């Protein structure tokens, strides 16, 4: 079973540092989890992930279930040996994919029936099946099946998704207990953009006593301030001693703000996806490497960055690679963006431990105003 120890609590905010201990190692929080949808973080190897100081990565249950499938995963001993990753893995339940591929999915009391986007075959995810598949994957942290509601949504729609999510959470938890509490299962708070519904969801899930909790249904098209409002409202409703995870978020600014609200875990495709689109994150903000201003620029992407890319290559060379659509561009850009995100979390942890989180936050924004 997972253990979570709170190391330091900021006196200036709800920010805190912690330590999650799993069967595959320790995770220092707050932490960002690179997304490896299909058992790979696109464009980089596990060795490069480790060099970027990745402590835990995320796998996608929906996609891995469809390809390569449970038979292959079971035969190979799970996702860890399959991809040669010996550190913790978190897997989602498929709920967000059913939301994003809504035309292919139907929500029922039993679970979610859906059509494969690969070959059109029909499948059913029940709360029990979602836990079973994640157990086959060997996830250190599994997510309960949830109903993610988009934005905007009516109160009636949000309430329906909340009720279904709670019912599924209880069923998934019961199955997890029957199977011997293999690995760890988190519940997911829903409730749309209605604070009172999120309070209800949080209380219901807290009563089920999961090892940790995710706050879902954010970053689904709502304004940033509304996302912050919902997160700020929800975090205190959940057990203080349990890790809290905001799913699918987000920008560097999002991470700083939400960590200040007491969020411990984050994931997002942004650093890797944006790297492939030429958008790079630096201590002074974002840059588009295709910009003509970098054609003769001999400087690194970020003078403050110690990543492999910044230590070895110029902006001019990286621009050339990207404009030429050379595959190396995607690798070097992704290494930099992941290093930036993970180093940002490292800096945050240090600041919280040293009692200067607010000073860190002010400096973070000051650099972006240059």
Curated annotation (Swiss-Prot):
The active site is at residues 92, 267. Its cofactor is Zn(2+). Binds 1 zinc ion per subunit. GO terms for biological process: queuosine biosynthetic process; tRNA wobble guanine modification; tRNA-guanine transglycosylation. It holds the Pfam family TGT. One of its GO terms (molecular function) is tRNA-guanosine(34) queuine transglycosylase activity. Substrate binds at residues 92-96, 146, 190, 217. InterPro entries: ArchSynthase1/Queuine_TRR, TGT, TGT-like_sf, tRNA_ribo_trans-like. It catalyses: 7-aminomethyl-7-carbaguanine + guanosine(34) in tRNA = 7-aminomethyl-7-carbaguanosine(34) in tRNA + guanine. The keyword Glycosyltransferase applies. Its EC number is 2.4.2.29. GO terms for cellular component: cytosol. Pathway: tRNA modification; tRNA-queuosine biosynthesis. Homodimer. Within each dimer, one monomer is responsible for RNA recognition and catalysis, while the other monomer binds to the replacement base PreQ1. Catalyzes the base-exchange of a guanine (G) residue with the queuine precursor 7-aminomethyl-7-deazaguanine (PreQ1) at position 34 (anticodon wobble position) in tRNAs with GU(N) anticodons (tRNA-Asp, -Asn, -His and -Tyr). Catalysis occurs through a double-displacement mechanism. The nucleophile active site attacks the C1' of nucleotide 34 to detach the guanine base from the RNA, forming a covalent enzyme-RNA intermediate. The proton acceptor active site deprotonates the incoming PreQ1, allowing a nucleophilic attack on the C1' of the ribose to form the product. Belongs to the queuine tRNA-ribosyltransferase family. This is Queuine tRNA-ribosyltransferase. It comes from Desulforapulum autotrophicum (strain ATCC 43914 / DSM 3382 / VKM B-1955 / HRM2) (Desulfobacterium autotrophicum). The gene is tgt.
């Amino acid at each position: 079973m997972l253990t979570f120890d709170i190391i330091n609590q900021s006196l200036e905010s709800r920010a805190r540092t912690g330590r999650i201990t799993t069967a595959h190692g320790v995770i220092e929080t707050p932490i960002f989890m690179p997304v490896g949808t299909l058992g790979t973080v696109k464009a980089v190897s596990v060795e490069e992930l480790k060099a970027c100081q990745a402590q835990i990565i995320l796998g996608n249950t929906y996609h891995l279930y469809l390809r390569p499938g449970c038979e292959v995963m079971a035969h190979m001993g799970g996702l860890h040996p399959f991809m040669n990753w010996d550190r913790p893995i978190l897997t989602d339940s498929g709920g967000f994919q059913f939301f994003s591929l809504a035309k292919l999915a139907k929500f029922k009391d039993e679970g979610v029936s859906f059509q494969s986007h690969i070959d059109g075959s029909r499948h059913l995810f029940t709360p029990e099946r979602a836990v079973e598949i994640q157990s086959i994957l060997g996830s250190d942290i599994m997510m309960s099946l949830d109903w993610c509601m988009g934005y905007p949504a009516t109160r009636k729609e949000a309430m329906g998704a909340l009720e279904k999510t709670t019912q599924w959470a209880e069923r998934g938890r019961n199955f997890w207990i029957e199977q011997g509490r293999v690995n760890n299962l988190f519940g997911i708070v829903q409730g749309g953009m209605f604070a009172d519904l999120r309070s209800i969801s949080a209380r219901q899930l807290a009563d089920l006593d999961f090892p940790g909790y995710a706050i879902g249904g954010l970053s689904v098209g709502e304004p940033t301030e509304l996302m912050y409002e919902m997160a700020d409202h929800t975090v205190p409703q959940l057990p203080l001693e349990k890790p809290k995870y905001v799913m699918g978020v987000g920008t560097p600014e999002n991470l700083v703000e939400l960590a200040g609200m007491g969020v411990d875990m984050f994931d997002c495709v942004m650093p890797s996806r944006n790297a492939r689109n030429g958008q790079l994150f630096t201590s002074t903000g974002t840059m588009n490497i295709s910009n003509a201003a970098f054609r003769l620029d001999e400087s690194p992407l970020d003078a403050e960055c110690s990543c492999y890319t910044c230590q070895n290559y110029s902006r001019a060379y990286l621009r050339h690679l990207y404009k030429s659509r050379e595959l190396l561009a995607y690798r070097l850009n992704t290494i930099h963006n992941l290093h930036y995100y993970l180093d940002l979390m490292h800096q945050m942890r240090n600041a919280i431990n040293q009692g200067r989180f607010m000073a860190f936050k002010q400096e973070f924004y000051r650099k972006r105003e240059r």
